[in-house]
Amino acid sequence: MSADQRLVATSAPRRRVPAALAIGALGLGLLATPSGLAIAKPATPTQATAASRQAPDSLFPEQGSSKYDVKDYAIKLGFETSGDIKAKTTLTAKAKKSLTSFSLDLEGLIVDKVRVNGRTADFSRRDNKLIIKPAKTVKGRFSASIAYHGKPVTHIDPDGAQDGWIPTDGGAGATVLSEPVGAMTWFPNNNTPRDKATFDMKITVPSKLEVAGSGDLKSVRKHAGKETWRWVQPYQQATYLAMISISDYNVYHSTMRTTTGRKLPIWSFIEPKLGTVADERALIPTIIRYEERRFGPYPFNSAGIVVKETGVGYALETQNRPVFDGVPDDLTNVHEWAHQWYGNSVSLTNWVDIWLNEGFATYAEWLWDASHGGPSTAETFQKEYDSHPATDPLWTPAPADFDDPADLFGSQGYLRGAMTLQALRQQVGSHDFFIILRTWAKQHKYGNVTTPQFIRLSERVSGQDLDAFFKAWLYIPKKPALS
């Protein structure tokens, strides 16, 4: 999925176009198998309030809640090759005020029992909300455990794409790809990127299967024809970036040194019929070090890739370990790794700011291409600017001002987002531009951001008034004039 492929249509394609062919040469020992086992509107608020069912996201206002912050998710999930799961998710959270009830996002699945602070709680379902009424009003820090089972559904996005729980291997496997809201198909959660948390996932499968995950691999425990894979994410992670992928994989383990000398384990999971994918695996250390020199230190403790024909037609930057639908090309690899800085460590507050993810990752492709015999970023910018007339769909809607969630993965976030960054570079100069990129990654590491924050940083570093510049490039649905 090269940059050109992704920008053929207005509906940009890192997420919407099948991964392209690649090249394949590094490999270190196989691991082996894992095991598996199958696993309404609130009452009228009083002084002790019912938690809002919604977090104020402009594109997905029905998702998430703003009345509490989740600190950690502990997920125990058993999977059977029938496609059924049996699971328990325990979350630790902090209520922002006393709550008589609160809600989590959950699509499909059958809830068996809910406990809050160790006591059985009442619950009900409304649309994709699990509404929980504790036996006692929740104050401050609290825990909630939800036991559930069933066959997870696949969520259909507003643009028609699939996300969430994706059955593979004829239903005998599965891969989780949750951007933007698919996380609710496999565990109950506060499904908004503004509420990041740490994760501890224990996934039990039949011993003939392996489990890839986001985070760091802590253990693989064998027991009675099953294996339990434990993946721990010690850093803040948005719910859509939590990933598991269950299949018959070849597992490759190696290590690398970052530019700061840190030793980084690399765990990659490759579908056997796709070969060893050696070239793209070998490229991981090179890409990470390349991006470190431009964006700052790699923000996580491990790396790797998952290469699997999922049939969804897109790759996703799941934290630590991107997932590719088939063997990726170099630029797709570069794109997904750039997201570890911009999107995963530095995360959105509101989905309307998706350009802060996709524009940055697309610009990383331009940088890589320019450093490896391709056109300069200025040449790429000019080519794209000249080849898209004022009537082209690229220019509408604006990257940071649209209201249709079906436009979330349109080219305004990818291509026009990258063009905005190059235009900024030409406006403030390369020196200040790269200070802005590195400061953005450092200042907001593991946090959440908005477009106005990026504008303020750019003005502070450059000493320029950039209001008119950013208004033209990000907020007006028309082709910006070049100064």
Model-derived regions: residue spans:
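N-terminal, polar/Ser/Thr-rich
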Residues: 2-7, 15-86, 169-171
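Hydrophobic helix-coil surface modules that form long, contiguous segments used
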Residues: 87, 192-334, 363
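Surface-exposed beta-strand/loop patches in extracellular or lumenal glycoproteins
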Residues: 88-109, 187-191, 199-206, 452
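A surface-exposed beta-strand-loop module
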Residues: 106-167
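Second-shell loop/turn segments in exported
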Residues: 131-135, 188, 270-279, 322-323, ...
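Glycine/proline-rich low-complexity spacer/linker segments in large multi-domain proteins
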Residues: 138, 148-199
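Amphipathic alpha-helical substructures
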Residues: 410-483
